[in-house]
Amino acid sequence: MSQSKRILRAIYLSLFFIGIFMIIDDIFFSHKSPSVMDKEIGFNLDKDFDIDNSSIDEDYALNLSANSKDIDVETGIYYATFSTFRGDLISLKLKDHLNLEKEPTEMVKVNMDRESLFYVTLDNLTRDLFSYDRVDDYTHDFKTNFEYNGKFYEYIKRYTFSNKGEYLIKLEIFLNNIDANDNSDIDSYKFVLSSDIEKLSERGKLQYNNYLSQAVYFDTKLRYGKDGLSVISPKWVGSGTKYFEVLVSKENMNVEFKQESKILKAFILNKVGNKNISDTFYIYAGPKDNGYLDLFNKEDLNSFGLSNVEFGMSVEKSLLYFIQVPMQLIMQIFYNVIPNWGLSIMFLTIVVRILIFPLTFKSFRATAELSKLQPKMKEIQVKFKNDPKRLNEEMGKLYREEGVNPLGGCFPILLQLPVFFALYGLVNNFFLLRGASFIPGWIDDLSIGDSIYYFGYKVFMWTDIRILPFIMMVTQLISTIISSNVSFKSLGSQQKILYFGMPIMFFFILYDMPSGLLIYWITTNIFTILQQYYIKMNVSERRNR
């Protein structure tokens, strides 16, 4: 078997195992929606809710909104804006996390129907603006009165921010019947999560993934929401992108997902009975990072005294999570010594390559030794070309005499695939790489592609001229040629396509990938080139003994 065929076989085997890995990861570790089972269905959304969106006519609502006032609040981590119209939170920006325009990331966007990040259907009963009261630096009240079925109610929304800089807002809903002798005619209401975390243009699509996914966590399971799915007593429900999310938690809540105007929303049912309302919602709005999310698993770690909320389960974990955890720790150690995440990726790559060097050494040495047998192998192929059985016997005899395993170069490569996938997942999703600069003016954000020129529009498939993909392609091509142990002139046309096609193919695949991933790839290629020189010297010394 020729060397090019062996390499091609290794590529096919690699692709096969990549496919198997993706299937396993998709089946066991992706967050798919469960089927709507009897256990999960606990209510009928339209039947149980008697307050709809038509309580106030459109013109009246528009006039009310036009006369409302905005209330600006600044905390250690948020820029928040409230409106006296419905007492809504209409803007929530993260002070410490900037977008590509170097502005605070917006977590709330009010849509054309004036729906905010979240809203309460009780708002539809109000016919007056809310009054505002600043209780203290962290607590803000919005209050109004309204009439329903001939009875008068006092309606209060109380927002409380953390005094410890946590990405959590406590929202308390109070509804009191002003006539204490009367029972309430409002037996339930909806809390609707309809978040729209800031998305970027095509240029930054890989930074934010430009999509929202709804999720719910219940019975120790994380699932994506879908139209018609209802869940009893989940720990939380929320929406998220690649790096940010909004999660809502409340005791004894029931949730149903429903499609409205092509938008999937999460409806939280709150049954009241004939009593006054006093409900508390905890709303996490911030980075999708366990360092922030896990603070709410122990009451002594957060200012709200929350425990076992399990917000951290919203962070997707792959099949190779157990490998990614030590890798992340190593990156963090390097960053603590040299505060540059780009260098941390390079050092991590070198450490990983050193650790798996015995495998790669065996693979490259087997390939190098096998290439030395090419003249003898060709003689056997010519001599027994009409006798396949004898050909295989003689080839096997040659391998045994020379002490060479023809598959010795394949299996070590396959064993390295889990490490590659783990590194890819870590570099591609690690929150701290977002906005992290490596080389200012060139690689300003490791979570997106590098750029030396931005077109302002799409040219073919691209929006930017990038340098790292070209460096990656050249270094991979050099690495492939050096590893082949075959002169360029001796390659046939198909072999040349094989050798040059892979680097070019990866160039197009990885062109818009995060620069942190390309730094890993380039470092790997350079390490492989240096490693191959060492292996060639080692093989040469062995043959001279």
Curated annotation (Swiss-Prot):
Subunit structure, briefly? Answer: Interacts with the Sec translocase complex via SecD. Specifically interacts with transmembrane segments of nascent integral membrane proteins during membrane integration.
GO CC, sorted alphabetically, is:
plasma membrane
Gene3D superfamilies in the cross-refs: 2.70.98.90
Determine if Protein biosynthesis is one of this entry's keywords: no
Name of the protein in question:
Membrane protein insertase YidC
Q: Which UniProt keywords apply?
A: Cell inner membrane, Cell membrane, Chaperone, Membrane, Protein transport, Transmembrane, Transmembrane helix, Transport
Q: How does it sit in the membrane?
A: Multi-pass membrane protein
| Function according to Swiss-Prot or TrEMBL | Required for the insertion and/or proper folding and/or complex formation of integral membrane proteins into the membrane. Involved in integration of membrane proteins that insert both dependently and independently of the Sec translocase complex, as well as at least some lipoproteins. Aids folding of multispanning membrane proteins.
By sequence similarity, the record places it as follows:
Belongs to the OXA1/ALB3/YidC family. Type 1 subfamily.
Q: Does the keyword Membrane apply?
A: yes
For this protein, the record's InterPro entries field holds: Membr_insert_YidC (IPR019998), YidC/ALB3/OXA1/COX18 (IPR001708), YidC/Oxa/ALB_C (IPR028055), YidC_ALB_C (IPR047196), YidC_periplasmic_sf (IPR038221)
Q: Which domain of life is it from?
A: Bacteria
Q: Name one GO molecular function term.
A: membrane insertase activity
- Which BP terms does GO give this entry? protein insertion into membrane; protein transport
Membrane-spanning intervals of the chain: 10-30, 319-339, 341-361, 407-427, 467-487, 502-522
Q: Where in the cell is it found?
A: Cell inner membrane
